[in-house]
């Protein structure tokens, strides 16, 4: 299978799972909150889910198996904290340290979670939160989250080879072209 076909298959799998979670819970609320730069929480978690599945497939070709369903749901719910952490609300202080526990609490309100899904959500901020993941799936999401956050923050500020100013310009992944234009002045 070509890389393009594999990526399309993963994208469809993530979209389907996200629609299911949106119907059963409040995942669509994450479209309203910005995570990194001008990327919404929804766009971020779907990117993390795609990266996690891609990495899991590479591991699978090396003979290392994962619980794909828990990996996907955990990736989509890892930032299910359901608030705008940019608001000056005192409860949002130390968001980086505390949001995994808020996300886990909200996810447990809306969904029945497996132990692996709980581990993914609670431990994805390692090493900032100093308790490491204890399963492969949580390690995968932890690493995919770091990679996607890097791309969303740093890479969005770097000049592109094609001369465009914004990594997310014209994106359909939940990032806002309008807010990109506001940032540029």
Could you say what each language-model-derived stretch is?
Residues 1-185:
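Metal-dependent phosphohydrolase cores
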């Amino acid at each position: 299978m070509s890389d393009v076909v594999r990526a399309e298959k993963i994208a469809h799998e993530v979209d389907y799972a996200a629609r299911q979670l949106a119907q059963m819970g409040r995942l669509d609320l994450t479209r309203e909150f910005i995570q990194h730069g001008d990327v919404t929480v929804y766009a971020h978690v779907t990117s993390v889910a795609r990266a996690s599945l891609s990495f899991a497939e590479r591991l699978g070709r090396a003979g290392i198996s994962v619980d794909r369903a828990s990996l996907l749901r955990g990736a989509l719910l890892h930032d299910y904290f359901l608030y705008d952490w940019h608001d000056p609300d005192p409860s949002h202080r130390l968001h980086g340290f505390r949001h995994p526990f808020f996300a886990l609490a909200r996810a447990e309100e809306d969904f029945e979670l497996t132990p692996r899904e709980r581990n993914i959500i609670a431990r994805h901020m390692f090493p900032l939160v100093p308790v490491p993941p204890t399963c492969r799936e949580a390690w995968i999401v932890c690493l995919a989250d770091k990679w996607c956050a890097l791309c969303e923050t740093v890479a969005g500020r770097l000049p592109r080879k094609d001369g465009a100013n914004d990594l997310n310009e014209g994106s359909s992944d939940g990032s806002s072209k309008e807010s990109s234009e506001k940032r540029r002045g």
